Amino acid sequence: MTWWCDGSPVRDAEGIIADGSIRSGKTVSLSLGFCLWSMSRFSGQNFALCGKTIASLRRNVLGGLKQMLTARGYTAAERRGDNLLILRRGSVENYYYLFGGKDEASQDLIQGITLAGALFDEVALMPESFVNQATARCSVAGSKFWFNCNPEGPEHWFRKNWIGRASDKRLLYLHFTMEDNLSLTPPIKARYRAQYTGVFYERYIRGRWVAAQGLVYPFVAEHPDSYILRGTTAGMDGAFYISIDYGTHNPCSMGLWCVQRTVAVRLKESYYDSRALPVSYTHLRAHET
């Protein structure tokens, strides 16, 4: 929360990105840090508090944030009709406008305003156009960007254009895990770890930007020899089935299976991708498994 303070080796960074697992303290740390920074560095300026929707922003951020600020001697007054939070402490007063970035049209709502900084809570849920418009509004000298999110897929625009270019953009990047949240008891952390599997475990618990593809059946990737039949399939006997995963715009896949009791072996397959292959082309491959 104090990376921006005098004496910090990263105080000149243009902003901060915090990603990682759920319940790791990202929202609390960044929202409080954002307000402490803005109230220490500016007075009479406009700031943006951005969430997926204004309702989720009020529910997930503002409630706890106002309590923490009040405990530190700040006065927080909210004008709900204007979607505005006014913070005061002594002679310092700043204005925090609430914005929802739920779709492409949301960028129109933030146009025109001049900002001294912006906080993006769950930025990975927002469209890129909204984030680009909001960051373009931060033209006051000394303004900074504050981002937090849970991971999505590896090709997500925020991972590629912001996390992947954090050094070029002079942004501080922090990765959070549940171990960073000292308020979570060991039983609660154990419950979360047991609650998810596959891609959801990788994203929510380990905080990794992973794709669902290839993780639907992770046990196959982890123990491939248990699922590959070595040798020839010639003369194999059993009940034969043809599986079809039909697609026109998406790939079409058909397979010839031999089922013996509880074991099913895919003998041959036909695969067609209309986006990659000529219309007249059909690929048939025999598995020597």
Regions found by a protein language model. Give the residues of each.
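Inter-Walker segment of RecA-like/P-loop motor cores
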Residues: 63-113
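Walker B catalytic acidic pair
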Residues: 122
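ATPase catalytic-site recognition across NTP-hydrolyzing enzymes
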Residues: 181-246
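Short beta-strand scaffold segments in enzyme catalytic cores
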Residues: 252-257
